Amino acid sequence: TSGTTILPSLEFVTESAYYDETTKLGGEGAPKVEYVVPEDFPAHTVKAMTDGAERVYEFLSCRGAIRVDFVVDETGTAFALEVNTTPGLQEHSNLPVSCAHAGISYAELLTGLLAQALAEARPAPWVTS
């Protein structure tokens, strides 16, 4: 596709039984969570997630950054769970962490998203000249 960047997958490793809001947002008393790029996924699993995320992006005519969440079973089959069209942009959020693993700095992520938004901006339909 033109200009689409597929970022590395992240696996959430936590001592909690669930990856819930408390775990995700951290803070005092929250279970520790670590985001790692899984090294042990079979190639077909990585390809299925990459291709699936790209197809979703195109099908929904997305712009900017999205996050597609998958769960992978013990056979390596990936199942799409949801599409997040407004992923978090705090430095410790999933999108900036995945960008960091891809060599994209936090500043590059933010300026890239802003530049794309400005380039694609159109006047609102209710604005008259």
Describe the residue ranges of each PLM region.
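Conserved active-site and cofactor/substrate-binding residues in soluble primary-metabolism enzymes
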Residues: 4, 44, 48, 90, ...
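Generic hydrophobic alpha-helical scaffold/packing signal
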Residues: 10, 53-57, 110, 114
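Active-site/binding-pocket entry motifs
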Residues: 12-15, 27, 89, 119
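Beta-strand scaffold of nucleotide-dependent catalytic cores
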Residues: 1-23, 68, 79-84, 93
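Short, low-complexity, polar/charged sequence segments that are solvent-exposed and flexible
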Residues: 4, 16-17, 25-30, 40-42, ...
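C-terminal active-site "lid" helix and adjoining low-complexity regulatory extension at the edge
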Residues: 72, 77-129
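Proline-rich low-complexity regions
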Residues: 8, 35-38, 87, 96
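A long amphipathic alpha-helix within ATP-dependent nucleotide-binding catalytic cores
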Residues: 28-73, 121, 125-128
